[in-house]
Amino acid sequence: MAQNKPNAFMAFVADWRACNRFGRGLSTSEAVAKCGPIWEGMSDRERGPYKSKAKDSNVLERESKTERLNCPGVAFSKMQVEKNEAIDAELQMKRNIKRIVLKATNSMKLEEEEFLFVSFNYFTKALNGDVYQPAELSACRFSLKGGISSNYSTMINPGHIIFGQTSDAQDHSRTTHKLPLPPNAMGEKNLGNLYSDTLKWLSASNDEEDEQYDHPVIVYTTPELMPVVKSCFRYLACEGDTDKHAKKIIVYDICYLFLTLKKTVLDLVGVPSDHMNIHVTNSFFRRDFFEFSSGIACDYHEEVDRTKYCTKSMVLRWGYMISHYICGDLAIPLQPRKHVPIEVKHSYTVTPGDSSLALDGTSTDSGYSGY
């Protein structure tokens, strides 16, 4: 049996039921019987809005029938729009990273330019949306010359696990960070205060221009963690007094930052950089040869032998990796705890010059000029 097309009278019935407290308790047939006499007494002018609404509904129905859908019922056109938006966002991110590095280079402050690295652990991910429930947060402030100057780390107790996700959360915790689940989770329970404190710490390095024009805070993480970091910041922001701060944190790809820095530094010292690409820098991060360094994780993950998954260890290792592959080209001496873990000996020596950008700094047995 063919489905009846929307008509003006039924549009009126739906509107009457929505606006009439008595009508909400009636069935459709009862509402039709009640509205019949009212409809008959209405003029063409009064019926006009309902005729327009019915016409619009018929047009939308015809369009939906001709629209191609995928298996879950999502229109291909909508998927294409989302794909184009993602491509545009990635291109904008790359342009902004290049602009940041170029600005620091032109002002002769590339070595002092500070970058913020952020990582999250999570308990579970919602099945029907891009929502990650945060479990641990760490961030560090990094520059080529000073290495890691400060770090921020905290565990998070959201109070409860997303309904129906306890088993998934247990599996994820057991195979990764091994943090106890809510309500027995460790760390901060007031997520609103935690978000405010985190935003305050991240904003501490903003210069006068950033404060004057209310520029967003830019943080960097790995491509795999970008959706996690974005979602966890949104989760914390929703618990705050206001959501207006959510737009103040932008998450960028640390691998592309690494690529941009490396190519820029090689150009500065006159070394060809054509062989450098995103696949090379991604392989450096996947190699992660500081993964098993001791003394860089939080006390809890050191105790349970899960230092690899500790967010504090992650952000410190990212700083160490960038230092390892770039500082030698700029003749910057590696300082323990700032550029490398305290027990690691770097594989090159630096001959001091008038400036760390001077080319009389030499690198031996390091392979920096080759990468």
UniProtKB/Swiss-Prot annotation:
Q: Name one GO molecular function term.
A: transcription cis-regulatory region binding
One Gene Ontology cellular component: nucleus
State any GO BP term from the record: spermatogenesis
Q: What is its main location?
A: cytoplasm
Where in the cell does this protein reside? Cytoplasm; Nucleus
Family, as annotated: Belongs to the maelstrom family.
Would you tell me the protein name for this molecule?
Protein maelstrom 1
